Amino acid sequence: MRLSQEVFALAMEEKAGICYQVVVNGFTAVRCFLTGTDESNIVWLERKKNTVLKSRRSSLRCGLEAEAAGSLEPWQEDEELYVIRGGGYPIWRQDGTFVGALCISGLHHEEDHRMAAEAVRRYAERRKETGHEGSGIDRG
């Protein structure tokens, strides 16, 4: 099962009105809008993606780190490009190579983050069960 299928299955399981995108090597591989979302969510997806690609960390973690440091720099330099709220999640290969981002929008930002983390966890678990843990996208 692909990562995008894990996100879709999780959204169906939780009856979550989300949109999501999977970005690999800078290119959007999948973008899906479920009931309850619309084109306005694209802005959130893009800002979360930009944050993850710049930092190689989750957008929620970037926000928590900025809050702890007492500074929103460098995220304030262009608020139209970045957002330090949950829902942008990094994708890493098992060998430690950064691959891209899974971004979710449509729920409270902490729920967006939780869903992304859970989808990546399920995907990694499934790859391990099928003997593919040494290649592909395995952890986030």
Where in this protein do the model-derived segments appear?
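N-terminal targeting and processing segments of secreted/endomembrane and organelle-targeted proteins
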Residues: 139-140
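Flexible, solvent-exposed loop/hinge segments and secondary-structure transition points
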Residues: 1-92, 97-101, 107-128, 132-134
